[in-house]
Amino acid sequence: WGGLTAKLHGDPGVPMISCSIFDQSYTRALCDLGSSINIMPKVIFEQLQYPALSQTRMFVQLADSTVRHPEGIVENIYVRIRNCFVLADFVVLNMDGDLGLDLILGRPFLNSVKARIDVGSR
């Protein structure tokens, strides 16, 4: 049925936005209603040269069911979307390869910006 639905209505694609952290711009930030956390790949954390990374004992289960132990948590990072600045915490994960995205913005972030995701329009 999924293929038929996509043919009838069209695939709305993946909800991505552009944002900035410090002087770095990211064009592939995934708005993920299925994620209860915000995720930042370790390579991006290292590019930011942010000094503080809090240790954590949590484990993260990814969409492919693999379980990872994060490098840590970076707290109170200002994320800029257009002219708005939003404080966010990110779980920093060592990710394998290029995922095709820069950040994962989960429900906590989407809630704080009062995001509305409309997959019915393009």
Regions found by a protein language model. Give the residues of each.
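Proline- and glycine-rich low-complexity segments
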Residues: W1-R122
